Design a protein with these regions (language model features):
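Beta-strand->loop->alpha-helix junctions that form or flank phosphate-binding loops
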Residues: 96-97, 108, 114-126, 157-182
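Gly-rich Lys/Arg/Thr-decorated short loops/hinges at beta-loop-alpha junctions or inter-strand turns
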Residues: 54-66
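Short, Lys/Arg- and Gly-enriched loop/turn segments at beta-strand edges
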Residues: 47-54
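Phosphate/diphosphate-binding loops
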Residues: 1-46, 127-174
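Active-site-proximal betaalpha loop/short-helix elements
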Residues: 66-141
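Conserved small/polar residues in nucleotide/adenosyl-binding loops
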Residues: 186-191
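Short, surface-exposed amphipathic charged segments that create phosphate/polyanion-binding patches used
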Residues: 134-136, 180-184
Length: 191
């Protein structure tokens, strides 16, 4: 691509798209928050897998474990999630990928329906982590942040029984992103 300042080269990028038949359009949901006072569930494990992440690049971290993907485990997790979705238990959902949980929560809140309060001590993990940056910015694969109406919380938890799933927060009326981890608290500045 040529500009006045010279050429701009786009790095080679692998893109994989999937297509399928939507049997029931009522099962199609968006990624924007739907209402305040709803609950936020994280499905999938968050591990200390910061290698190659946006956080690592931004902070000059050159080592760190690169996220590993367990396709078989993720498929079973997604089947349980799909069952909850098609049962009408999910208001909205967003995959957690580049930028981690913090970026995903912020993207969901862009709808203007409210803010997000997260309790990082509730984030599902197998091996834990030493830094509060990990649950916020890890790019562990296979995870989804799911908005659920409190009325359907018990049903959603039943649908996800046996899988890594925890209520890690809620949607607030105040348009802020707040994350707590033990005694640490971070609140985004007012808009």
């Amino acid at each position: 691509f040529e500009t006045e300042d010279g050429p701009i080269n786009v790095p080679v990028t692998f893109l994989c798209s999937g297509f399928g038949v939507v049997e029931n359009p009522d099962h199609v949901i968006g990624s924007s928050l739907r209402r305040s006072n709803s609950l936020l569930y994280l499905i999938g494990h968050t591990e200390d897998e910061m290698g190659g992440s946006v956080f690592a690049r931004t902070h000059g971290v050159e080592d760190g474990k690169v996220p590993q993907t367990d396709c078989a485990a993720n498929m079973e997790l997604y089947k349980a999630y799909y069952s909850a979705l098609t049962s009408g238990l999910v208001l909205s959902a967003h995959d957690i990928s580049e930028g981690g949980l913090a970026v995903t929560a912020a993207e969901m809140a862009f709808s203007g329906k409210g803010g997000v309060r997260l309790d990082l001590t509730k984030v599902p993990t197998v091996n834990g982590w030493k830094s509060p940056a990990v649950p916020l910015f890890s790019e562990s694969t296979g995870r989804i942040l799911v908005e659920v109406d409190p009325e359907f919380a018990a049903d959603f938890e039943t649908a996800m029984d046996g899988f890594p799933c925890a209520c890690i927060g809620s949607v607030t009326e105040e348009k802020r992103l707040t994350a707590t981890c033990c005694c640490l608290l971070y609140t985004s500045p007012s808009p």
